[in-house]
A protein has these predicted regions:
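Charge-dense, low-complexity intrinsically disordered segments
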Residues: 8-11, 64-68
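Short alpha-helical segments that sit at the start of domains
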Residues: 1-45
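Sequence-pattern detector for short linear motifs
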Residues: 21-23, 47, 76, 108
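Intrinsically disordered, low-complexity regions of eukaryotic proteins
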Residues: 6, 16, 52, 57, ...
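Short amphipathic alpha-helical interaction segments
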Residues: 65-83
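Short acidic, hydrophobic short linear motifs in intrinsically disordered regions
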Residues: 30-66
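Short, cationic-aromatic polyanion-contact patches
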Residues: 92-109
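A short, conserved structural fragment
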Residues: 82-92
Length: 109
């Protein structure tokens, strides 16, 4: 068994990754939306579960982060979803909406 503490590089192509991001945002049908960190964590888990990571099978990942270049891809694809009016950014810090942690959220349009 191999252990890897490096950020995880995912192998999803842009279209597949974009659809996964949209599904996560739409599937979280709450007014408070989903944070960037939560989206990246779920994408990381999906990539591990689907064997779509750059490291060989049997690797135990000890880092919760996507590789920096994949975080940039996620960010760019989220902006595409915003421009397509499929999601929007929820700004604000309302404890009533559960927005007290300082992170803006992505919500289904």
């Amino acid at each position: 068994m191999n252990y890897d503490a490096n950020p995880i590089h995912i192998l999803f192509n842009d279209e597949n990754l974009k659809q996964r991001l949209l599904a996560l945002i739409v599937g979280n049908n709450t007014p408070s939306g989903t944070t960037f960190n939560a989206l990246c964590f779920h994408i990381r888990q999906q990539a591990i579960d689907d064997h779509a990571v750059a490291d060989p099978d049997g690797t135990v990942y000890t880092n919760d982060e996507l590789a920096p270049e994949d975080q940039l891809r996620v960010s760019r694809l989220l902006w595409e979803l915003i421009w397509e009016h499929k999601v929007f950014l929820l700004f604000g810090r309302s404890a009533l909406l559960g927005l007290s942690n300082g992170e803006d959220r992505f919500v289904k349009y």
